[in-house]
């Protein structure tokens, strides 16, 4: 298909999107036919890692369609889906079509429906359609036209290398597709490779088990590493018909680099196997330097961008998750806008984010939110914007701000400005409460207490979340002031700037030791981590009085890094110790203040942990965790190799 998985993902209890097409060229004189093949999509089946979310919106897919035909004489006809004139057939070749589990296709059933797309097809044996009653929790929705780009094929990859049998005598053969991306296989099977009625199994993996003792002792070295797919089966099954067969699933997608084919009489030649790479976006950026490792890093960034921008921005394209995590999206939205034109894509998803926000403007930790609900209850599902904290929530401000600054387009600001005000006002009205060195819990209204439970998630060294979270609070005030000016709300803008100035003063008072310029937490304990300096420097929160010492300390946390991280791995100079909150701020916080030598050394480091370490290990995408794989410890099992 030219467009995949329409009408895409939204928060279906509030928004049902549709796609429009000009079908003039398809209409012919006399009878015409109109039909559709339905898959689970994001409506039914497995949609998250929570078992309770299976069939979250409904337990069967349905079609809502309308065609308006305007004739040259000024008259018109309207054709709609109804429960009388349409028919359906549920014993076709597609036996299972799950985004997470894969597609099961029986080609022997094609003959029974041959010609079904033609107007003269006899559907008298088919079943008359009936209306599917929407669960009451999802019956009050707004029907809207999508304005983002549909998922589509962005390129087709060939096999890089045929790796032979998984294990001798297994009858399973592995092929390396060259890069870890999102897509589906296209497999041509000549008739001499399998008999009609036989089933071919296709499995997928991001990576193979290496020849480390941990894996050779278990005999799994060289096999697909699928444990990080968790409960997602990620397997396609194809039942052969007569003659040459071509299998290309189009109601699922997988995140993978390697495929394993089982069930053929002999190894399939590599030129019989292709990969259709899928994304909502076409990458438009190019990067080339004298350092081949950084060139590959940029290619990896591009792969992870396109792989995770499939209808919504996801955390991973392969396992039982693939959810619109707000923290991940917030962190990467600005960078992603350099890789591709993300404006319409992000604007569309922000509709879902707003639908999941409560009155405070706080977003969910992922959107759609999949809030637990009672099937028997009459109330609409409550959206209270629960998440891990400001690193996740602040997307309601930062994404509209960054996309406006990148494009100059106002729609995304106008769409979100009321929610931005609600969120920033909520932060400002929730005073910081902390435990001081005496064990008391005073409050300070100059800073916010709405910082959450996680901040610099997945860092190698922890940093106080209240301190970092309040930097993001100040940044939200700054950005909200700019956006208020953009929409002509000058009084609001001035109010936010005054609040930000007060918050900056308080932040420096609370979190900087005036004698050493080192950062500290609310108890007065010295932090002195890369994150504790990078984030406040990036967002210009450090006062002029503290700046010189803070820069010296920040530079030292990189150039003189030492010790061990929480995994017992050594920390060496010019390597990273940061996580969600601060990693994206490291280089800006150096280059903005003239520390360019340190910035280049940090960027080009190949030691663990660094941006280039995964590249030296053969990565073709961005790993979720610094310790996704190390030579010393092997794989971290709960890990996406494409985030």
Predicted feature locations:
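Active-site core of glycosidic bond-cleaving carbohydrate-active enzymes
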Residues: 42, 324-643
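Extracellular/oxidizing-compartment recognition motifs
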Residues: 1-319, 327-328, 344-347, 364-368, ...
């Amino acid at each position: 298909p030219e467009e995949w998985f329409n009408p895409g993902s939204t928060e279906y209890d509030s928004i049902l999107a549709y796609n429009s097409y000009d079908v003039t060229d398809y209409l012919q004189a006399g009878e015409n036919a109109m039909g559709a093949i339905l898959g689970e999509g994001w409506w039914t089946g497995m949609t998250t890692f929570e078992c309770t979310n299976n069939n979250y919106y409904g337990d069967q897919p349905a079609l809502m369609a309308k065609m308006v035909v305007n004739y040259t004489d000024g008259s018109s006809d309207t054709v709609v889906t109804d429960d009388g004139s349409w028919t359906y057939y549920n014993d076709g070749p597609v036996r299972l079509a799950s985004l997470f589990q894969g597609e099961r296709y029986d080609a022997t059933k094609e003959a029974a429906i041959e010609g079904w797309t033609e107007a003269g097809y006899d559907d008298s044996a088919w079943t008359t359609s009936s209306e599917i009653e929407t669960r009451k929790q999802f019956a009050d929705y707004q029907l809207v036209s999508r304005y983002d780009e549909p998922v589509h094929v962005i390129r087709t990859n060939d096999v890089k290398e045929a790796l032979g049998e998984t294990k001798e005598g297994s009858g399973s053969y592995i092929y390396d597709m060259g890069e870890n991306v999102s897509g589906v296989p296209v497999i041509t099977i000549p008739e001499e490779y399998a008999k009609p009625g036989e089933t071919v199994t296709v499995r997928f993996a991001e990576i193979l088990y290496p020849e480390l003792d941990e894996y050779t002792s278990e005999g799994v070295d060289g096999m697909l590493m699928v444990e990080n797919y968790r409960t997602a089966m990620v397997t396609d099954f194809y039942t052969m018909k007569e003659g040459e067969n071509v299998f290309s699933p189009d109601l699922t997608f997988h995140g993978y680099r390697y495929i394993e084919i089982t069930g053929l009489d002999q190894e399939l030649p590599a030129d019989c196997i292709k990969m259709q790479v899928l994304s909502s976006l076409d990458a438009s950026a190019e990067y080339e330097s004298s350092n081949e490792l950084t060139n590959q890093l940029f290619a990896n960034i591009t792969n992870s961008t396109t792989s995770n921008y499939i209808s919504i921005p996801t955390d991973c394209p392969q396992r039982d998750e693939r959810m619109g995590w707000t923290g991940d999206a917030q962190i990467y939205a600005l960078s992603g806008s350099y890789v591709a034109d993300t404006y319409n894509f992000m604007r569309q998803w922000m509709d879902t984010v707003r639908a999941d926000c409560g009155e405070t403007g706080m977003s969910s930790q992922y959107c759609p939110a999949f809030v637990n609900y009672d099937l028997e209850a009459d109330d609409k599902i409550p959206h209270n914007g629960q998440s891990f904290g400001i690193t996740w929530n602040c997307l309601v401000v930062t994404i509209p701000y960054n996309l406006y600054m990148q494009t100059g387009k106002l729609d995304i600001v106008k769409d979100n400005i009321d929610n931005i005000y609600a969120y920033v006002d909520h932060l400002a009205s929730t005073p910081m409460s902390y435990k001081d060195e005496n064990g008391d819990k005073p409050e300070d209204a100059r800073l916010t207490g709405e910082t959450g439970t996680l901040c610099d998630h997945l860092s190698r060294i922890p940093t106080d979340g209240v301190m970092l979270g309040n930097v993001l609070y100040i940044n939200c005030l700054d950005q909200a002031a700019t956006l208020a000016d953009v929409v002509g709300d000058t009084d609001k803008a001035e109010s936010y700037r005054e609040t930000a100035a007060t918050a900056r003063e308080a932040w420096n008072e609370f979190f900087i030791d005036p004698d050493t310029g080192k950062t500290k937490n609310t108890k007065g304990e010295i932090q002195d981590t890369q994150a504790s300096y990078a984030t406040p420097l990036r967002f210009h929160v450090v006062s002029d009085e503290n700046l010189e010492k803070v820069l010296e300390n920040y530079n030292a946390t990189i150039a003189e890094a030492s010790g061990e991280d929480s995994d017992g791995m050594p920390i060496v100079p010019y390597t990273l110790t940061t996580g969600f909150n601060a990693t994206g701020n490291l280089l800006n916080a150096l280059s903005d203040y003239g520390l360019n030598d340190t910035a280049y050394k940090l960027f080009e480091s190949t030691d663990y942990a660094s941006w280039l370490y995964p590249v030296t290990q053969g990565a073709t995408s961005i790993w979720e965790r610094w310790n996704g794989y190390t030579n010393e410890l092997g794989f971290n099992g709960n890990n996406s190799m494409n985030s």
